[in-house]
C-alpha cells in the first residue's frame, strides 16, 4: 500500500454517488493505492483518466484507465476503497529508445517515467535511479557497455545524463552547449565506442555537440 492519491504529485479526483447524482463523495482523502506487484508505479498517481467502468456482474468493482495504465478497485463502496495497478504487460508508457546490450541488459528511455533497465524482457524492469521524467535519446558505448548516455526533459527540467556503472548511478550534466543562455533539452545522443566522448543533438537546436 502506498500513500493516497495524488501521491505527492498531480492526479485526478474521484467521486461516488449512491443517490443518482444528488450528492457526491470525494474519495481522494479516503482511498488507498497498491502497486499490484509492479514496483515502478508506486511513486505515480492516477491521472489523465479517460474512462471508468463498473463491472456489471460485480458493482463493487471499478476499473479506471489512467495515463500510466489500468487501476482496479474491488471494494469501491467501502470506507477506504483500495485501487491497485492492474496492467500486466500493457502499461501506458511511450518508449522513445530501446537498446539490447549483447549479453547484458535491455535498456530503455520512455516518456514521463525516465526508463528501465531489465535483465529479463519478460519481467518488470527497474526504473532508472535518476527519475528524470521524459527521456528521448539513449546510447550505449559499444566497447564499454557499462557506459550509457541519455537526454530529454524540457526548458524547466532539461536533462543530459550519463552512467558508467550500468545505471546504478547517474550523473546530470548541468552545462548547456547552446549560446545566449538558451537551455538545451530533448533530442538524441551518441557515445564513442570507448565511452570517452559523448554527442548530443538537442531537440531545440540544429547542431550536434
Predicted regions and their residues:
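Long, non-globular targeting/processing and low-complexity regions
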Residues: 148, 172-176, 198-201
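Residue-level marker for isolated small/hydroxyl-bearing positions within beta-strands
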Residues: 2-6, 64-65, 109, 150-151, ...
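Ligand-binding grooves and catalytic loops that recognize ribose/phosphate and carbohydrate rings
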Residues: 140, 148-157
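Asp-box/BNR beta-propeller loop motif
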Residues: 8-39, 60, 67-93, 111-129, ...
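Conserved core beta-strand positions within WD40 beta-propeller blades
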Residues: 61, 105, 146-147, 197
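Short coil-to-beta transitions that initiate beta-strands within beta-rich domains
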Residues: 7-9, 33-56, 82-102, 127-145, ...
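Long hydrophobic segments that form regular secondary structure
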Residues: 44-71, 160, 166, 186-199, ...
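Low-complexity, Gly/Pro
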Residues: 1, 142, 171, 193-198
Amino acid at each position: 500500500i502506498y500513500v493516497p492519491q495524488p501521491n505527492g504529485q498531480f492526479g485526478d479526483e474521484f467521486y461516488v454517488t449512491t443517490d443518482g447524482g444528488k450528492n457526491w463523495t470525494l474519495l481522494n482523502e479516503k482511498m488507498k493505492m497498491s502497486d499490484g506487484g509492479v514496483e515502478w508505479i508506486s511513486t505515480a498517481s492516477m491521472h489523465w483518466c479517460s474512462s471508468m467502468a463498473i463491472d456489471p456482474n460485480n458493482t463493487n468493482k471499478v476499473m479506471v484507465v489512467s495515463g500510466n495504465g489500468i487501476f482496479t478497485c474491488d471494494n469501491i463502496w467501502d470506507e477506504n476503497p483500495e485501487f491497485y495497478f492492474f496492467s500486466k504487460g500493457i502499461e501506458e508508457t511511450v518508449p522513445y529508445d530501446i537498446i539490447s546490450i549483447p549479453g547484458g541488459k535491455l535498456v530503455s528511455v520512455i516518456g514521463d517515467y525516465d526508463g528501465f533497465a531489465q535483465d529479463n524482457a519478460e519481467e518488470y524492469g527497474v526504473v532508472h535511479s535518476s527519475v528524470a521524467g521524459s527521456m528521448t535519446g539513449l546510447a550505449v558505448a559499444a566497447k564499454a557497455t557499462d557506459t550509457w548516455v541519455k537526454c530529454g526533459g524540457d526548458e524547466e527540467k532539461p536533462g543530459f545524463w550519463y552512467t558508467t556503472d550500468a545505471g546504478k548511478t547517474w550523473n546530470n550534466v548541468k552545462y548547456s552547449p547552446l549560446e545566449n543562455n538558451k537551455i538545451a533539452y530533448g533530442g538524441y545522443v551518441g557515445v564513442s565506442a570507448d565511452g570517452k566522448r559523448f554527442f548530443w543533438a538537442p531537440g531545440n537546436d540544429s547542431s550536434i555537440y
